[in-house]
Amino acid sequence: GIANLAKQVNAMGLKLGAYTSNGTLTCEDLPASLGREQYDAYTLAKWGVEYFKYDYCHHIPISRYAPLVYSISVSQFDSHPMEYSVHNAVLSGLARFMTDTKLPSGSYVSGLDANQGRITYNNVEVDEDGKYVLTVNIKKKGAYEKYLIAKINDDEEYEILFPPQKHYNLTARFQVIVNLKTGKNKIELFNPVTSNADSEMYQYRRMGKALKDATARVAKERKQAEKPIVFSICEWGWGKPYNWGAKAGNLWRTTPDIRPWWIWIKIIYEHTVKLYKYASKGHYNDPDMLEVGNGKLTYNQNVSHFSLWCMMNAPLILGNDLRNMSEQVKSIVTNRNMIAINQDPLAKQAKRVKKGVVDVLAKPLADGSVAVCFFNKSSHGAKAKFDLNSLVDDKYVGLQKKTEYAAKEQWSGEKLTTSGTISVSLEKCQSKVYIVK
């Protein structure tokens, strides 16, 4: 089974990854995980999976519609529920009372669609801290899906999904288990979805939480250390995941799929290099797997590709056949100097500090040094120079001012000293990377 496979893969010094989709089917039209997040996350954790890519094929967005709420109730699992009419709440935005004498409360609240309004209960009182059943009572309307977030005490958020309703009865109720504290609690009801990007964020956050809960559960059941799962968000950059990815997972794809085409690798680089401010420790922009050794890429292109991915803190996932790798390709992807730059504990992505035929990238490192990459984007040779002193005043890079800098190129081992300027001569598509101290 997969659990045994994970052990075999780990014994080879590798980690096991798995894949599914934030949709009804995967990109190969196999069963996927939308709506099954907790079950599938628990399965992955039991298997010992260490890396999980969550794709975007056959995706179904969350509804921007909200139900018509007439009351809520709160109860412990073995107690009588305490009901709160909407008249006990404060309405904001476009939320408004609508009369319906057939309802127990005599009215309901509409106007919660697409983050346009919300219901806030400030007086939900319980006797002790713990888990409670929150029931949302609604008036049925429309054979279409609806959605609410229940936000508790300005902190935890709980999703409530409402399927299409049939009108055999006037009302329906839907429940979620929430954490409440002793005394008065604040409960807000709203639908935050105004765009597909909002929908993506909440769905990927749902899976991210499910993975964390699952690894903690398995560790507790087995009485062993927790084995976390790296969560890779793959919605191809459509919903600007760099804005919300850190709240959902560990890395997020910035573009559609990579190919072993030099022009496409450069396009992905151009898009991803601009996103440096969004990366942080444990949260990274993902320009997709490495194509080093694939297609018709030249040696210089392979070196530049690997160098740029290292500078941008990209996950270094090999996309080539590990069983059939040339010594040249192996020497590139196992360059310990470049891998150390990528894995530096400061975890700051390189910033492009000069743009042109030759781009210059600067990546601050934990020991106070700076990695400086010269990247020749052209199909002909080029010369370039760069004044290191310009990095002293750069608040992001923060190079320490010195009268003389020592620099070492990480591919050739070339060493130099300079009072400020580094000059390079580059072949077509070539990159050089210096550690400057």
Predicted regions and their residues:
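Glycan-recognition surfaces
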Residues: 202-205, 209-321
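Loop/turn elements at helix/coil->beta-strand transitions in domains of secreted/extracellular proteins
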Residues: 10-17, 47-52, 216-220, 225-230, ...
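Catalytic cores of secreted or luminal carbohydrate-active enzymes
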Residues: 304-353
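Aromatic- and glycine-enriched glycan-recognition loops and surfaces
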Residues: 1-21, 34-38, 205
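Intrinsically disordered, low-complexity Pro/Gly/Ser/Thr-rich segments with frequent PxxP/GP/PP motifs
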Residues: 416-437
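Carbohydrate-binding surface patches
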Residues: 137, 309-312, 317-319, 354-395
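Extracytoplasmic
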Residues: 67-198, 393-404, 410, 420, ...
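Conserved, mostly hydrophobic/aromatic
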Residues: 9, 231, 311, 372, ...
